[in-house]
């Protein structure tokens, strides 16, 4: 009951302020010059994934840990707070690897410093914290949030901000957006295998209150001349996929239409049972896989019945355009 009340309050907040925040979707366009700082830099996760980001040649320029300010970690400076880190490094993005109890405050600290792109990997952030964050987020137009509870965002062969395996990515022409982390990797691997590669891959996360949705990413993909096709991976719960379908119906048509392939997880999920992600639940008869699949197909999207068919379905969709 409390979760439903929180959800209703968040939706009310969204409607009035969303347009102001929506202008920040361009902050998703990361590249080889994007400067990244790490919040929770010296912790176990921050260290491990910070190393991997550096190995991918991401421009990590420092990190934040108030208790170790003034020292170095992984050969990079550690700052007292995000504001100091941004002032001294000119950071364009921040990635957050801090425990759930402190993650909401970490996002707000990055917002206070007006970091253009904030990627929060942390899972299990209390919903009440995220409602507070979302309320603040929608009232400003400087910071774009990806996540929480997500694998991050990657511009293939240029910049990796998150926990995704870099080696499966290859520069190419497919834009990928997904609520599921592991299914994102499946789509990436398949598009690499069939020779398409990727432009930008965004894991938007599986929580009910996230900073970036399907439509934000579709905006980027449809405007980007390098992106020739789109893969959208959804799951049960909420109405994000139906809203994305309506957006595609209106904005992706005619001679310049880009092929879109989708997979929806949770076809056999029983109503009322949460399936992994906090937002993956059929509630009140809404958010079923069937509703989402029908809406997407009506918008001209090719919906596969298995994630193993994403690559071949995209190849077939391209052949249909020739």
UniProtKB/Swiss-Prot annotation:
Binding, CoA: 42-45, 68, 121-123
SUPFAM superfamilies, per database record: NAD(P)-binding Rossmann-fold domains (SSF51735), Succinyl-CoA synthetase domains (SSF52210)
Pfam families linked to this entry: CoA_binding, Ligase_CoA
One MF term in the entry's GO annotations: succinate-CoA ligase (ADP-forming) activity
Reaction(s) catalysed (UniProt annotation): succinate + ATP + CoA = succinyl-CoA + ADP + phosphate; GTP + succinate + CoA = succinyl-CoA + GDP + phosphate
Highest taxon above the source species: Eukaryota
Biological process annotations from GO: tricarboxylic acid cycle
Keyword flag Mitochondrion: yes
UniProt-annotated binding residues for substrate: 185
Compartment annotation: Mitochondrion
Keywords for the protein's UniProt record, in alphabetical order: Ligase, Mitochondrion, Nucleotide-binding, Transit peptide, Tricarboxylic acid cycle
Keyword field contains Transit peptide: yes
Matches recorded under PANTHER family: SUCCINATE--COA LIGASE [ADP_GDP-FORMING] SUBUNIT ALPHA, MITOCHONDRIAL, SUCCINYL-COA LIGASE SUBUNIT ALPHA
Its job: Succinyl-CoA synthetase functions in the citric acid cycle (TCA), coupling the hydrolysis of succinyl-CoA to the synthesis of either ATP or GTP and thus represents the only step of substrate-level phosphorylation in the TCA. The alpha subunit of the enzyme binds the substrates coenzyme A and phosphate, while succinate binding and specificity for either ATP or GTP is provided by different beta subunits.
Protein name as catalogued: Succinate--CoA ligase [ADP/GDP-forming] subunit alpha, mitochondrial
Gene from which the chain derives: sucl-1
